[in-house]
Design a protein with these regions (language model features):
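Tandem CBS (Cystathionine beta-synthase) repeat/Bateman regulatory domains
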Residues: 1-147
Length: 147
């Protein structure tokens, strides 16, 4: 049985583990789907945040959402890439963490999501917390206590 003292995690917050916004690919409201698809493909991410010009978080967009938006009744309508905007296909109802949220809350949320967007108290995008960052910290703590 693995046992790690609870206090090991009480002073760890989302802001301590997240990747800052400057290092995260994103698109803005008003961008076309073609631009969003290019950013997704070039970055290698499966989904990216959608921000307004002031960096407020509005949702996520993924390659699957873009492809779904291009589906017609009988074919993929590639011309929709030029016609449609990010906000027409993005997902607005997404899980979000605050900078001061606890490690425990972050751990619970990353069970179902590969990453969670982190925002400040006003809803402005600050970065992402990845499942990888959570697992790295857990692995480190387990190794420390199993010596």
């Amino acid at each position: 049985m693995i046992s790690i003292p609870k206090d090991e995690f009480q002073q760890i917050f989302v802001k301590d583990l997240m990747i800052s916004s400057e290092k995260v690919a994103h698109v803005q409201i008003g961008n076309g789907l073609e631009h969003a698809l290019l950013v997704l493909v070039k970055s290698g991410y499966s989904a990216i945040p959608v921000l307004d010009p002031m960096y407020k978080l509005h949702g996520l967009i993924s390659t699957a959402m873009i492809l779904d938006g291009m589906l017609g009744l009988e074919r993929i309508e590639f011309e929709r890439l030029d016609e449609m905007k990010v906000e027409q296909v993005m997902k607005e109802d997404i899980p979000v963490l605050k900078l001061e949220d606890s490690f425990a809350k972050a751990l619970e949320m990353t069970i179902d999501h590969p990453f969670i967007c982190a925002v400040n108290e006003d809803g402005y995008f600050e970065g992402i917390l990845t499942r990888r960052a959570i697992l790295k910290l857990l692995n480190k703590k387990v190794r420390q206590h199993n010596r």
